[in-house]
Amino acid sequence: MPDAEDVRRIALSLPDTTEKTAWSMPTFRVAGKMFATLPEDETSIAVRCPKEERDELALAEPEKFWIADHEAQFAWVRVRLAALEGEDELRDILADSWRQAATPRLLEAYPRLGLPPAG
């Protein structure tokens, strides 16, 4: 099961990522835009996720994903670390969120992390 140190290590391994404390918790940012937070209890993370996809995830896997009341109007979802299958799943979730916050220049510079090709 991934833990808070895995979140920090993986998030900071993504290009141009910085850590900044906000609301008394670690947040991870790319180009100044937040893409992940690690709430104080360190049992979950919040990540960017398009609202439609977020709603589907929360319905399909409520033991893993949920929408915090104070984040309902935003395109964010909570993820229970204990419910993840391992570091690979955590890495995929953090990379997906990073892509949503990264600049087009970063997406072009890191095609492995960039958006999937059209077609």
Residue locations for each model-derived region?
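Charge-dense, helix-prone N-terminal extensions
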Residues: 1-119
